[in-house]
Amino acid sequence: MRIVKLTEDTKKDILTNLLKRSPDNYGSYEETVKNIVNDIHSRRDTALFEYTEKFDHAKINADNVRVTEAEIEEAYTQVDAKLLETIRKAIVNIRTYHEKQKQWFDSENNGTLLGQKVTPLAKVGVYVPGGKAAYPSSVLMNVIPAKVAGVGKIVMTTPCNAEGKVYPTTLVAAKEAGVDEVYKAGGAQAIAALAYGTES
């Protein structure tokens, strides 16, 4: 991590450099992502597996793309008991917060009905980054609101390493939060697979 000290003397240069990261510089990335999304849409699993090998250096296929219960059980053996306790406490806290956002109705003295209606989707896809570090908080902050809302099925994708392994803390957080299926895929190709579906 680069630490930058913002002072009156350095402020102008720092802000100028930050503003250089404008959307104008993202054209080539956008084109790359569009090509990946279109390729997943047309070639589905074949494209997903090719991109996973290209970007994550992992050879996945229809037989190993989905995380198994055995892999989840193994992940539990690799997560410290104190961390597991922290994950469980975070789940309670996040659930408590989001339950306050559930639907409610009230009526005014003049008969006006006010409120919020929450209609959950039947199934959602959740993407959790994981190329260089584990992000169990991303699992919890995406999955728990969906569970509180009443989503019926939650499918998650997250990158695996070259050996086809997913970070243990990510898998444990997914299991504890109630994810139904976890797939080993990252990046734009994983998000496109969630959106369009593939054979696996």
Residues covered by each model-derived region:
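Active-site-adjacent beta-strand anchor residues
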Residues: 41, 157, 184
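Short, structured coil segments at secondary-structure junctions
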Residues: 150, 177-178
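Conserved NAD(P)+-binding/catalytic subdomain of aldehyde/semialdehyde dehydrogenases
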Residues: 178-200
